[in-house]
Amino acid sequence: GDGTLNECVNGAVGHANVAVTHFPCGTGNDFIKMFGEEKERFFDLAELVRGEVRPLDVMECCGRYAINICSVGIDARIGTEVHQYHDSYIFSAVANLFKGIAQPLTVRGCGMEYSGGTSLICACNGRFYGGGFNPIPDSMPDNGKLEFLVVRDVSRLTFIRLVGKYAKGRYRELEQYITHLEGDHLEIDSENEIVVNIDGEALYGKHVNFDLIPGGVNFLVPANMAFFHPETAGGHETREFVHT
């Protein structure tokens, strides 16, 4: 699953003679959803054996590596506390909504310097997380940049209204609440300890960094795969992975 993939990535970064892949037997298997219907090819061990090794970007966050998505804010709190509510995301979400959505954070990087109430920040190298949230649908793990969404302080009612669009990647319709950034570095400071979601794993701290490592890990994929993109004919891009 995604958690095991994250562990493997953390062991493989920096080793040019090592490649990792994803045999999807976990609960979410979010990372490979970016391949659309072709993600089913990852179930075929023979295809993986005959596959191709491609360099993918990773991000470094708080001393750990992530290949997919990291986040800070209410979604990270909901995911971290879900086990306190009998593994119910709904109960965890309701509880955290009543606790309050925004936290006072200072955000720097990608041309932004902001201090104030912040509901959520996601750092995307991949596309899907949390069982199907797709905040930045055209994020690419091989294009040499990270993409970020900063959701500012919003009321509970506004958050409930916007979360559906956030989950579907329609952030451009919410520019009054959400700022989109691109770059290779973002840092967050908080006076209080906050939880950070790193590919589904939780860490805690008062200072959080997201730093790009271009081509940081070799990833094995079935031959001639392309990323899913709903705006292209047939739903798949015509280009292959970027070769480096």
Give the predicted meaning of each segment:
Residues Q84-F91, P137-T158:
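Gly/Ser/Thr-rich active-site loops/lids in small-molecule metabolic enzymes
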Residues G109-C110, S115, M140, V150-T244:
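ATP/nucleoside-binding phosphotransfer catalytic cores, i.e., glycine-rich phosphate-binding loops
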